[in-house]
Amino acid sequence: MFKYIGDIVKGTGTQLRSLVMIFGHGFRKRDTLQYPEEPVYLAPRYRGRIVLTRDPDGEERCVACNLCAVACPVGCISLQKAETEDGRWYPDFFRINFSRCIFCGLCEEACPTTAIQLTPDFEMAEFKRQDLVYEKEDLLISGPGKNPDYNFYRVAGMAIAGKPKGAAQNEAEPINVKSLLP
């Protein structure tokens, strides 16, 4: 009999403690954000959607060197090189399968022209998996991205309309890397 009364007192105490705890949490600041109305805080170096940028002249920065595809641990990047009449390389097609991408950022680190960059955009939900395969037209943005003044061909040098490398306007003289060796 005393055991039965002890169980009732113990159960009532547990219920009262739970009610006090719930009542106390009702006046605290909410941890949950109302997502669409309140934007989510993202870290400054958050790695989200991948984009292809343009150089300051408005041309594609990508030179189809294939380093991003080689660096990708899951193999979600595919591209094919083409060449313009003046010898400039560009990707004939550039494709990223975001259903396989792990957003590790290795492609961005491998890119010598800073053409491929990760943005803080994370809203990429789709109903069909095929819609997560982005082509070059979907990835290209109108601006230069994180490095607005960098132009790969000004740094690397390229013969333009009969001029030798380094003789064009705003182009630095090419550096002989063998002269830099110790």
UniProtKB/Swiss-Prot annotation:
InterPro entries in alphabetical order: 4Fe4S_Fe-S-bd, 4Fe4S_Fe_S_CS, NADH_quinone_OxRdtase_chainI
Function: NDH-1 shuttles electrons from NADH, via FMN and iron-sulfur (Fe-S) centers, to quinones in the respiratory chain. The immediate electron acceptor for the enzyme in this species is believed to be ubiquinone. Couples the redox reaction to proton translocation (for every two electrons transferred, four hydrogen ions are translocated across the cytoplasmic membrane), and thus conserves the redox energy in a proton gradient. Required for plants roots colonization.
List of residues binding [4Fe-4S] cluster 2: 72, 101, 104, 107
Enzyme class name: translocase
Segments forming domain 4Fe-4S ferredoxin-type: 52-82, 92-121
Binding site residues for [4Fe-4S] cluster 1: 62, 65, 68, 111
SUPFAM superfamilies per UniProt: 4Fe-4S ferredoxins (SSF54862)
Induction: By low oxygen growth conditions, especially in rhizosphere.
UniProt KW keywords: 4Fe-4S, Cell inner membrane, Cell membrane, Iron, Iron-sulfur, Membrane, Metal-binding, NAD, Quinone, Repeat, Translocase, Ubiquinone
GO cellular component: plasma membrane
GO biological process, one term: aerobic respiration
Molecular function terms, GO-annotated: 4 iron, 4 sulfur cluster binding; iron ion binding; NADH:ubiquinone reductase (non-electrogenic) activity; quinone binding
One of the Pfam families matching this protein, by short name: Fer4_7
UniProt key word Magnesium: no
Complex formation: NDH-1 is composed of 13 different subunits. Subunits NuoA, H, J, K, L, M, N constitute the membrane sector of the complex.
Gene: nuoI
Topological relation to the membrane, as annotated: Peripheral membrane protein
The species this protein was found in: Pseudomonas fluorescens
Name of this protein: NADH-quinone oxidoreductase subunit I
Reactions catalysed according to its record: a quinone + NADH + 5 H(+)(in) = a quinol + NAD(+) + 4 H(+)(out)
Assigned EC number: 7.1.1.-
Similarity comment: Belongs to the complex I 23 kDa subunit family.
Cofactor: binding comment: Binds 2 [4Fe-4S] clusters per subunit.
Signal peptide feature range: none
Cysteine pairs bridged by disulfides in the record: none
Main location: membrane
Needed co-factor(s): [4Fe-4S] cluster
